[in-house]
Curated annotation (Swiss-Prot):
This is Probable GTP-binding protein EngB. It comes from Chlorobium phaeobacteroides (strain BS1). One of its GO terms (cellular component) is cytosol. Residues 22-192 form the EngB-type G domain. InterPro entries: G_ENGB_dom, GTP-bd, GTP-bd_ribosome_bio_YsxC, P-loop_NTPase.
Length: 192
């Protein structure tokens, strides 16, 4: 997949505000601060396309980006951030689970996992949820450049143990660009 253009389309906080256009949607999901927005900026070669922050929980809406005028990349709020109040967590959880389980135009979910913490219960639960919904998904191990060689192998092995139906596992570094071409090839399969 070659990304020729990428633009922000809209942010939504409710299911009834989702785009009516039925373009294929590739959804990016993961824990807070795993690097979803950074990955989107890296993939599209647009540094400020998705807002990034070192503060967990910055993305609080479903953010849509139009890619090549033929599909959407969708940046979801991160899960697992402890400092968000319980009411907000519940609302996010309800919105996101309804969106992921019922949205017909989702062609792929990309589960981002911090390679430094590959065995988090919340990531296990998300992989289980995606498998339960029957959603095709792939895994991207983020911040891969921060690991030593032995830790890289251990991280991949840990993720393989619970993401049994994952279509792919890509090691990714937004800094070096490692994994970018491989991930774009995988995404091309699901964008029609």
């Amino acid at each position: 997949m070659k990304i020729r253009n990428a633009t922000f389309y809209k942010s939504v906080s409710a299911i009834d505000h989702l785009p009516k256009e039925q373009l294929p949607e590739i959804v990016f999901v993961g824990r807070s601060n795993v690097g979803k927005s950074t990955l989107l900026n890296s993939l599209t070669a647009r540094k400020g396309l998705a807002k990034t922050s070192s503060t967990p929980g910055k993305t609080q809406l479903i953010n849509y980006f139009v890619i090549n005028e033929s599909c959407y990349f969708v940046d979801l709020p991160g899960y697992g951030y402890a400092k968000v109040d319980k009411g907000k967590k519940y609302e996010w959880g309800k919105l996101l689970s309804h969106y992921v389980s019922t949205r017909d135009s989702i062609t792929l979910v990309v589960l981002l996992i911090d390679s430094r913490h590959p065995d988090m219960e919340s990531d296990h639960l998300m992989a289980e949820f995606l498998e339960h919904c029957g959603r095709p998904y792939g895994v991207v191990l983020t911040k891969y450049d921060k690991l030593k060689q032995q830790a890289k192998a251990a991280a991949r092995l840990a993720v393989k143990s619970y993401s049994l139906k994952s279509k792919f596992i890509v090691n990714y570094s937004a800094i070096s660009g490692q994994g970018k071409e491989e991930l774009l090839e995988q995404l091309a399969i699901y964008t029609g």
